[in-house]
């Protein structure tokens, strides 16, 4: 008896997911494999992927255009949360996984599948994100992960696929593992596994080398409503267009690269290279606008929420009670986060040089040192006395 009768497989067209199709059928006794490829704005033509899946033995090959949903329901939530894993990574790849899990579950329910499958290996984060996402959305579905169990090397995996007529034009000169969507690219493996090796320039596609960037700065203005980016340079844009255009202009100036050692869910450290030009600038601009419109106690408390939120996304807990509760808190804080942030782009830097909001709680008359100063200076002495009273009592008892 096979492990499942009908399986919906998350499919990218790469070596592992292509080999998963005959492996599921011939090694694990699956009767039917349906593949699902998600279009998340990665820019690839998915028609050939459909044909490849059918050639590999799938009974049906699905392509879901979920780019708009990806930006609106996933990326924009992360922007409101200023989500940066370990203070650096804007989760451009991690954010795609709960959406793909959702698409897999929906397809399984629609086509009557009793299992879903993915091609993730045992050392990566994505296996956790897919497994937990699917579990949270439909705990009755089996989750199959052939690449986690088959114990084949890369060469053996390719040889297995070739037995079933699959062709893999793998280039030995390109040993990198790359993932891309509208929000950015992630690059790992190969020579990058040596943390002292400088990444070769050719791995970057969304961001220019500093030597190739314009010699004059460029200014952009991003408009926000309730914490969401809605306009670029005064022009209201739909979410996908805004991200796409901002990627181009920011990347042109060499902004948006990350080279970091990160702590994976499974307990190992990994060297990762990311490109996420628009997402990084949007988070920075959003955080700056919050500093203008939120009270200090909310701003400081929200920082802890943001760190927890980032960890939930990274660790596969998008569909969790805590994540939903944090969303409610974050949404409430964003009611007055409206306004415009001005950014100067030049030679790899994105510097915020201005911000304005009708809901600003910055008061020039209180902040100024000029003649228009309205601050009550006499109140400072009494404030300091009360504020420092615990310190005074402690000092008198211990130093006197």
Curated annotation (Swiss-Prot):
- Which reaction is the catalytic activity of this chain? L-citrulline + L-aspartate + ATP = 2-(N(omega)-L-arginino)succinate + AMP + diphosphate + H(+)
Biological process terms from the Gene Ontology for this record are: argininosuccinate metabolic process; L-arginine biosynthetic process; urea cycle
- UniProt KW keywords: Amino-acid biosynthesis, Arginine biosynthesis, ATP-binding, Cytoplasm, Ligase, Nucleotide-binding
- Known EC number: 6.3.4.5
Q: Pathway of this protein? A: Amino-acid biosynthesis; L-arginine biosynthesis; L-arginine from L-ornithine and carbamoyl phosphate: step 2/3
Task: Give residues annotated as binding L-citrulline.
Answer: 89, 125, 129, 177, 186, 262, 274
**Principal cellular location given in the protein's record:** cytoplasm
Q: Which residues bind ATP?
A: 10-18, 38, 119
Gene3D superfamilies hit by this protein: Argininosuccinate synthetase, chain A, domain 2, HUPs, Single helix bin
| Broadest EC class assigned to this enzyme | ligase
Q: What does the entry list under GO cellular component?
A: cytoplasm
List the Pfam families: Arginosuc_syn_C, Arginosuc_synth
Where in this chain does the entry annotate a coiled-coil region? Answer: none
List the PROSITE patterns. ARGININOSUCCIN_SYN_1 (PS00564), ARGININOSUCCIN_SYN_2 (PS00565)
Superkingdom as given in the UniProt entry: Bacteria
Which residues bind L-aspartate per the record? 121, 125-126
Give GO terms: molecular function aspect only. Answer: argininosuccinate synthase activity; ATP binding
- Where does it localize? Cytoplasm
Q: Which NCBIfam families match?
A: argG, PRK00509.1
Subunit text:
Homotetramer.
Which family does the entry's similarity section mention?
Belongs to the argininosuccinate synthase family. Type 1 subfamily.
This one is known as: Argininosuccinate synthase
Q: Which organism is it from?
A: Crocosphaera subtropica (strain ATCC 51142 / BH68) (Cyanothece sp. (strain ATCC 51142))
Its ancestry begins with: Bacteria, Bacillati, Cyanobacteriota, Cyanophyceae, Oscillatoriophycideae
């Amino acid at each position: 008896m096979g492990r499942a009768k009908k399986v919906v497989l998350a499919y990218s067209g790469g070596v592992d997911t292509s080999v998963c199709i005959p492996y599921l059928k011939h090694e694990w006794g699956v009767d039917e494999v349906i593949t699902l490829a998600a279009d998340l704005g990665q820019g690839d033509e998915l028609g050939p992927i459909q044909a490849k899946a059918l050639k590999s033995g799938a009974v049906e090959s699905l392509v879901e255009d979920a780019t708009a949903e990806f930006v609106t329901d996933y990326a924009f939530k992360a922007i409101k949360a200023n989500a940066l894993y370990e203070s650096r990574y804007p989760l451009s790849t991690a954010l795609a996984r709960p959406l793909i899990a959702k698409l897999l579950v929906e397809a399984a329910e629609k086509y009557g599948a009793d299992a879903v499958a993915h091609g993730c290996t045992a050392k990566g984060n994505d296996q956790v994100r897919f497994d937990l996402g699917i579990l949270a959305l439909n705990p009755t579905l089996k989750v199959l992960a052939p690449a986690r169990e088959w114990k084949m090397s890369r060469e053996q995996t390719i040889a297995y696929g070739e037995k079933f007529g699959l062709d893999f034009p793998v280039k030995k000169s390109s040993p990198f593992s790359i993932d891309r969507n509208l929000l950015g690219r992630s690059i790992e493996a190969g020579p990058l596994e040596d943390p002292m090796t400088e990444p070769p320039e050719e791995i970057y596609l969304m961001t220019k080398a500093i030597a190739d960037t314009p010699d004059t700065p460029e200014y952009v203005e991003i408009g926000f409503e309730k914490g969401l980016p809605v306009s670029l340079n005064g022009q209201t844009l739909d979410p996908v267009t805004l991200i796409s255009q901002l990627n181009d202009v920011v990347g042109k100036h060499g902004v948006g690269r990350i080279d970091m050692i990160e702590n994976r869910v499974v307990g190992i450290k990994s060297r990762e290279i990311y490109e996420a030009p628009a997402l990084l600038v949007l988070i920075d601009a959003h955080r700056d606008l919050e500093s203008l419109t939120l009270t200090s106690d909310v701003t400081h408390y929200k920082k802890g929420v943001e760190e927890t939120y980032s960890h939930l996304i990274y660790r596969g807990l998008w569909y969790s009670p805590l994540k939903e509760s944090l969303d409610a808190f974050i949404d409430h804080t964003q009611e007055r986060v409206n306004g415009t942030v001005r950014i100067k782009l030049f030679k790899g830097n994105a510097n915020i040089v201005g911000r304005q909001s009708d809901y600003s709680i910055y008061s020039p008359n209180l902040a100024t040192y000029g003649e228009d100063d309205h601050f009550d200076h006499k109140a400072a002495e009494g404030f300091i006395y009360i504020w420092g009273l615990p310190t005074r009592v402690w000092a008198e008892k211990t130093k006197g």
